[in-house]
Amino acid sequence: MSVSTVGGDVRVTRWVATIAGLIGFVLSVATPLLPVVQTTATLNWPQGGQLNSVTAPLISLTPVDLTATVPCSLVRDLPPGGGVILSTGPKKGKDAALNALFVVAHGKRVDVTDRNVVIASASRDQVAGAGCSRIEIASTRAGTFATFVGLTDPAGKPLGGGFPDPNLRPQIVGVFTDLTGPAPAGLKLSATIDTRFSTTPTTLKLAAMVTAILATIVALVALWRLDQLDGHRMRRLIPANWRTFTLADVAVIFGFVLWHVIGANSSDDGYILGMARVADRAGYMSNYFRWFGSPEDPFGWYYNLLALMTHVSDASLWMRLPDLFAGIVCWLLLSREVLPRLGPAVAASRPANWAAGMVLLTAWMPFDNGLRPEPIIALGSLVTYVLIERSMRYSRLTPAALAVITAAFTLGVQPTGLIAVAALVAGGRPILRILVRRHRVVGTWPLVAPMLAAGTVILTVVFADQTLATVLEATRIRTAIGPSQAWYTENLRYYYLILPTVDGSLSRRFGFLITALCLFTAVFIMLRRKRIPGVARGPAWRLMGVIFGTMFFLMFTPTKWVHHFGLFAAVGAAMAALTTVLVSPAVLGWSRNRMAFLAALLFMMALCFATTNGWWYVSSYGVPFNSTMPKIGGITVSTVFFSMFVAAALYAIWLHFASREHGEGRLARALTAAPVPLAAGFMALVFIASMVAGIVRQYPTYSNAWDNLREFSGGCGLADDVLVEPDSNVGYMTPLGGDYGPLGPLGGQHPVGFSPNGVPEHTVAEAIRITPNQPGTDYDWDAPTKLSAPGINGSTVPLPYGLDAARVPLAGSYTTGAQQQSRLTSAWYRLPAPDDGHPLVVVTAAGKIAGNSVLHHHTDGQTVVLEYGRPGPGGDIVPAGRLVPYDLYGEQPKAWRNLRFARSDMPADTVAVRVVAEDLSLTPEDWIAVTPPRVPEMRSLQEYVGSTQPVLMDWAVGLAFPCQQPMLHVNGVTEIPKFRITPDYTAKKMDTDTWEDGTNGGLLGITDLLLRAHVMSTYLSHDWGRDWGSLRRFETIADAHPAQLDLGTATRTGWWSPGPIRIKP
């Protein structure tokens, strides 16, 4: 080939790189502004020509706008007492008047109220008169107004009113009325449902996105061709060292696979799985637990991958495969690319390789084994670092362009993807030097244009089905509602790490602190020594720059969660390998320095063990010390390591003053040979042993590993092990004959201090009532305080769990007058023969009761025990022993709960049981109340709820219940759930209730207004003392059927917006 031909090819390639790069860049940047097709939805009422109520719960809670027209003739036809003409929420819903719009006729007046504000009001006689033709109502961004057309006020102006406040737009869960019969002419309500996020790309936008992606690829290929002009060949795509496997490879990969099966999950797995399962029906990736159903964009492409995976299965093992893949690839990149790049001393060091592998595992285990994006970010940051280093090593720009792409996509996963940007910044100056050197040969634009296209092509993914306006609105909502914390509150992230909670647990502390220790040690040594044989200073400093840069960038992320530390897993492992070499005898010749590092490492271990061995939610089941500090023989492990730290520190001080003429001793060399891989390996064994112990202690009931293994045979997670009483009135035992007192068999012969109404007012199931009601406080807002008809033993106290007072008696010791010691011994109740389907005896009780539980261990209180008896002479029952109950809610004295007594704890020849209750305290708060014992009829939650009924699964529980059907939403309207599944009481109160509250745009804003929730009796099979959570059955407040929406389509530009969603209370 001639020189002119080569020159011509270069010119063509330069033009291709420039033009394709600019096309890719321009089209990518234009993508957010290009038009989309919106699915429009309108709620019109009445429907079917009849006056009936319909439901249409809006995921955004409020509409874009609402108009209504009510003929005044309807008021004339109402009974004298009046009624609801129309409303957007059922009148008996929780805080209905505070949230919804009502048009109500009273005996004397007709009022239009919206969110507890009287918009307009007129006397009923005026409205019913001939002068009034209709009531017109409009609620838009401009405000809410109503007019009685035909009527005038004393000033002669049209009678009406209103307020120019966009926050008065009412919540809509449907349209409800007290009217019946055919719909009269002129009655109409029309609401524009907010479906701004339900969009698909137009043909123009789709073509632009495809062209942008193709142009970027062409530009990168052209850039690669220009890279060849230096005449040097890059190493092969798959180098030789990738083809060999070592013992460390086997150990690390086996560790990843083993942890994938038996290991703990991350905190937001249920949250993310819930979004992924709902996305297909919704048409976009909505954050439907909060924030008014707004999309996750611009940080959501990884969740869309998970949504695609749900089409195959929702099982945990399948859904978490991307994280397993990311972990294994991280290790392969570390061992084959990163460690050799850090220098021959690091690559050749077996301790360094093991340090990298063990630190990667121990950082991965607490943070990166779930559905959260940290493992993908860890992989993306490592790939970016590898590509930057390869670009510098070979003076090529194509790897740098690919690094820009990986950094952009890593940032597109979550704001914490800034770690990949930190990798770009760390390598920025060397890359700029390469760019300056190469532009003299091929020019500037052929090099810059592909880079621009590479950095912006992510926009075609982020804005594939959303627009700039919708993403800005979603960002506004998340920022306004929060959490959205300022940069100067970054200290909270580290503060949470030292608290004795799951966020500050043993595993999470080690996962981050080992990285921090290695980082600061390496910085100190590298600053002290200008040259270290076998260590490449440039890559080493850039690695440290990545970590420091990430710590800086994390300040600007809106949330300060500890789980974000999972993104350090890969770079932290590389830092551990580098530090292992830096603190080796080959570099630190004086054993004093190495012993000082060992002392620091032991101090870090003591700090790690100075907390609980806690894991998130169900992952902690059966794990030793999951709520206390680990101990050995009564001595905390933290104390052991702290003692070792003191010894090592004293030894280091002694070495400082001892003579160095005789060299270092064998003890010092042995202790300081490889402390990092040994410490990390020890911690990996601790974590694995914790999970294995949990499996053994929990079997045959639920544990993470057992659940994962059952998935191969179609298991349904926790739903297979949670037992539900469909009807708690079933299973009550027959009392044996005898003479009873005024309380009947429950009170026995001589009850003292107990009465049928001895319970405080408004005592509800499994809940605390605090006045005034606090956010996160669980209370039954609609529970009656007194029955209209007395129960079987004269009690008027409402019973929990659906218990029928006409069949179930009650006896309580509460009184407001003079206090006395109260005692009760019930009649003997005949116990059925034992079988596997009836493992429990249950007593529904309330008050301050002594009992045992997994969480609280033993709780002191008054006595409620179950006494069991054997057959005696003459047919009498002879007491044979007593059982203290499993009481899950012992710290909630004002709560009904089910006290559990395991049949397996009773002798095989037990034939009868009775309740023995004693309230010996004279303090009014120390009351107790009991009902008769029963042997409950139970079914698994999977059998009872099934996989087709819509369920509101709190964000914490989703991964544990993969077979239940989440409540879906489409075209801006949600399904109406039949049940709610919550986590344990503490998590429900502090986490899910507050996060999903309607004030924050959560799903509870819908269910609270539209439904009533009733707690059901549930138990975790063979783990009777554990609070797994709760199942709540929803009951509709109003008789209504789902509304039919009027759907359509509209083409919208990228900057079109129907206005801000109402997010203020």
UniProtKB/Swiss-Prot annotation:
Q: Which keywords has UniProt assigned to this entry? A: Antibiotic resistance, Cell membrane, Cell wall biogenesis/degradation, Glycosyltransferase, Membrane, Transferase, Transmembrane, Transmembrane helix
Annotated compartments: Cell membrane
**Which pairs of positions does the record mark as disulfide bonds?**
none
Q: Give the membrane topology, semicolon-separated if more than one.
A: Multi-pass membrane protein
Q: Which Pfam families does the entry mention?
A: Arabino_trans_C, Arabino_trans_N, Arabinose_trans
Could you give one GO CC term from the UniProt record?
plasma membrane
Q: TM segments?
A: 15-37, 204-226, 241-263, 394-413, 417-436, 441-463, 510-527, 540-557, 567-589, 596-618, 633-655, 667-689
Q: Which InterPro entries does the UniProt record give?
A: Arabino_trans_C, Arabino_trans_C_2, Arabino_trans_central, Arabino_trans_N, EmbABC_dom1
List the molecular function annotations (GO) for this entry. Answer: arabinosyltransferase activity
Residues in the signal sequence: none
- Could you mention a single GO BP entry for this protein? cell wall organization
Report the EC number(s), separated by commas if there are several.
2.4.2.-
Q: Which family does it belong to?
A: Belongs to the emb family.
What job does the chain carry out? Arabinosyl transferase responsible for the polymerization of arabinose into the arabinan of arabinogalactan.
Q: Identify this protein by name.
A: Probable arabinosyltransferase B
Tell me the lineage of the source organism: Bacteria, Bacillati, Actinomycetota, Actinomycetes, Mycobacteriales
| Gene for this chain | embB
